[in-house]
Amino acid sequence: MLEFLDVVDVERIGGTLSRDFEVARVVREWQGRGPVIVYRVEGCPQDSASNLLDLKFKLYKALGVGSDEEAYLKILDAMSSPARPSVVGAPRLREAEGGLMEVPAARFYEKEAGLYLSSAIFIACYDGVCNASINRVLVKDKRVGVVRVVPRHLWELYLRAKSRGQDLPVSVVIGVHPAIMVAAASSPRFGVFEVDVASKLLGNLWVYESPVHGNPVPLGSAVVIEGLLSRDMAEEGPYVDVIGTYDRVRNQPVLKVLKVYLM
């Protein structure tokens, strides 16, 4: 993330923003105006950043391209011929005693179910298959969330674990280079690891083994949440989705948080 902030304009928002609607208001006010915004959310010891990919030129900078065509071709190439990242030793991390209450979950719209992490990247490895995907998390308390998991590759790994009476170990990262977000939002075939896709997009990527599960997580991730995508289910939603309407309430897997680490 930090290396990306060095190549774009950054606007620092003063003060501390309330989780209830103020984060949403500020993000909306600055959307499409150019800068990435950096701000502090109440209860969080770290800065947060938003509007990293709200304009096309930021996507170009993140991918190192100069046009839509170059972006498409680079993403397609990375999905078809991903590259293994370099494995390094784990950095010094600080355990967040407040758990999920120390990460920048916020409420964006009045009828939403509660505080949300809107774009957390879940990394899971099971049965020799690794996956990284973006999922929203409804924060219930410092050790519990509910995760919207669409029926794709993470769901497949979850069902495999569940069929054996197991919870799925997951490492959830927040605050990464936007090229990693692009890779996590892509759709390679099952078995292609999106972190490898990100490594190809960036030319190289450094990862380390997460402290609890040993999952490969990108070096420099601002937050690493070690948890279990459990067999327990709970209501998730409503939540305003990408088309601006309230997504319906569903029973979804409960995230049981084991540890939260901050850079």
Where are these regions (language model features)?
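Extended, highly charged
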Residues: 1-239, 244-254, 258-263
